C-alpha cells in the first residue's frame, strides 16, 4: 500500500478515533506532511520506539503503541512468560499515561497481567519493579531528554535491564510480523480490572525502592553530621525526579534542598527549556540563578525520566559554578565507593567496575589502583545491566559500580538501568565527606586529576537527516573502515578496533585479534599518548557520534590536546 492509500485508510476506517481522523483531515492538502507521517512504519529498534507524537504510521500514537505491544505479547507467550506479567511505568510527557494504559490493555487482551504505576515514575524504578514483582518484562513510556514533540517506548526483560540479544532481535521480529491493526488485541479497562489483569501499583513499590537506594549509602553518619551545612539546588526539569529525589535526600538527613519552583511540577510541554537535557548548560539557567541567590554548594538536574544526572559545583576559590561532565561526576562517585569500601573492609571479593567503551580512561587507572577489575562493554547502559546478570550467573565478579559518559551511573544491583536518584544520593554523600575534610566537589575532582592524570573527554554529534543523511553516514563509516588514518589530532593511530567485524588490528605489528564484544557498527582508534577516539552512528536518531579522550599533564594541556583531536576528527 502506498503512503497515500494508507493515509486514506486511516481517514476512513472507524477503527481510528474521530480525533485521529480529524487531525489527518486537517493535513489533506499537505502532501509532504502526509508522506512523512505514512511513508514507513515507526521503527521498533533494539531499544523500542521513539518518535514524534501524532497520527500516522510513522508517529507515536495509541495505534503504533498497541501494535508494538502486540508483538511483545506474542513474544512473551512464545517464551511461556505470560504468567509472570509485565510492569509498566511512564514519565511526564504528553500522552505518556494514555500510552501506558493502552500498552497494558493490549497485554491484558492477550491474557498477560500488567502492573501499572498509578502515576509518573522514574525509569530506574520500573527496572526495580520488574525484578521486585518477578515480571517477565517491563515497559517505560518515555523519550528521555528529547524535545517535547517526542515520546517513546522502552522494553525491559526479566532481569530488569533493557532488552539485549537475543531478546531484542526476537521481539523486533515479532513486532514486524504485526502488519495490520486487525491482528492487535485490546479490551476495556473495566473488564481488565475485574479480571485481575490490570493491577495498579504505587506506594508499596516506592517504599521498597527507597529502602534499596538508602542501602547504597556508605557513611550515613557523615551525612547526619554534615548535611545541615550543605546547600543543594535541585531541578527535576518538569520530569519524574521531584518526589523520589527529594524524599531520599530528606530521609538521609539533607535539610537544605532548594527546588527550582518553575521546573518542579511535571509538564510534558517543558515550558522553561527547549531541550530538557541535563547535559545542556541551558537546562541549568534557572537552577544556577537560584544557586547564586542561596549560595548553594552543589546544583543538580535530572532528566525527565530521572535516569541521568547533570551537576554544577561551586569553586570556592573563584566563587564560580563549574560544570561536571558525566565522566567527572561518575569518577567522583566511583572513587568514593572504592576508597571507602576498601577502608571499611566492605569491598566484596572479585570486585568489578563496569563502563562503556566511550567512557573515561581514568576508570582504568582508578580500578588498577584499587585492584578492582575494569570491564568494558558496548555503548548503552543495557550492556552494563547485562554484565551484572553475567556476574551473578557465572560467580566471576561482584559488581561495585557502573557508569557511562552520557551522565548515567548505577550503584548497587537493585535495578539494572542507570539511576539518577541513587546518583544524586551518592554525590551528596561525597559532598558531605568533602565538607567534613574542608573540601568541595571541585577540590575532590582536582585531587583525582593529580592522582590519576588529567583525563578529558568530548563528544561531537553530526545530524544528517532523511534518506540522503542515512547514506552519508553509511559512506562516512565505509570510508573510515577502508581508508583508516595514520594520525589524528597529532596523535599516532596505534590500533583500530572494528566492533562490526569483531577485530582489533595493531597497526605496528599487523596482528589482528578479537574485541570480545558483540557485533556493533562502531570504530575505535587507540592513539599514542593515552588518547583515543570512537565513531558510531546513533541507534535511534539520524546522527553520527564522535567520542574522543586524552590524558594531559595539566588541565590546560588536556584541553589543548582535546581541541586538536576534535578539530581533526570532526571538522575535516
Which role fits each region the language model picked out?
Residues 99-107, 150-157, 307-327, 363:
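Short Gly/Thr/Asp-enriched flexible loops that form oxyanion-binding sites at enzyme active sites
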